């Protein structure tokens, strides 16, 4: 029995959510394996219900599958029940679309969304039947590439990852695919050296690292790695058709990036630092993307994504026009957490004309002292005023994000979170 038949007939009937592993979602891409030259697995080291909503994976999936000679498939971290069955049977981790073992791919691309997924990456490599360490892999093994926010500090995963994409991956992923396409018969070393010549690609094997007597780690890089940056969001590739699952997701909606980067300097915010400079997408492009997404997916909610949506230069116009477009399809518009010191309540009112979901704010700290430490410049009265106005306009649910463990934090700062919420 081949792996596909084994998975469909004997393995998936034994797990609680088999629809997550079928690979037959609406807009999933299937190609003839004999008609492509390069096979890629885009691997997300978290559960399907979290990973399918990741916009970065949607973008890379669309970019690679537009190449006629490339087929990009997907794999997600197996849930405990599936992992137990795979281990018991000695079955390797497989791609969703074709049920091919990951070890048979030309390259595997991991999205490192956060440092907490590092161990899941190692587990997926192990479940694929591949050596964990990069220097133990042979010519026949796939090249393992990683990108995303967690790749900005590659050292913790350097022993296990062959190459890191530092920065935006929309352009780099095509260059990597073209590079490996031309070296399918090449040695592993030839592939790594070729990847190491690409802008924004860090190959640990090409960099010498030593530990001095005083314990300091020093590096002798072959060349300086410059972070890749997409400068024109209107010209940047985006998915023409989002994957629409048959299983329930944590965030069951489509996302459209309206802006990258952030003009604020919150001192705890990794995304605000690594996403610079600020870049915006035009309203015309956003409306076109909304129209295509609603028409091709049937999603009932579109999220306008950015680190601070209220700082979009034409925010009022954008929110009003987005709400009107969504209303035509009986859909909702949402935005991520909003900054209290820049939030205009009328923006929320504009999108609430379709369907009020909830408002999310990010105070992060509950005392003036700790807010000053992290550069969050607002007071309690601002929070109460904004929430009160939102409730008067019909919003019924408000969520606030707070952080515990910030530098200089005291017990008083933590207790103030509960006190502020009660008030």
Residue ranges and their predicted role:
Residues 11-41, 48-49, 204, 210-255:
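N-terminal [4Fe-4S]-dependent radical SAM core
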Residues 77-219:
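Glycine-rich beta-alpha loop elements in corrinoid/cobalamin-binding modules
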Residues 42-46, 64, 243-267, 294, ...:
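N-terminal pre-triad scaffold of radical SAM enzymes
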Residues 269-285:
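Iron-sulfur (Fe-S) cluster-binding segments and ferredoxin-like electron-carrier domains
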Residues 43, 292-399, 403-423:
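Conserved SAM/AdoMet-binding glycine-rich loop
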Residues 48-51, 80-83, 116-118, 151-154, ...:
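Flexible loop/turn segments at secondary-structure boundaries
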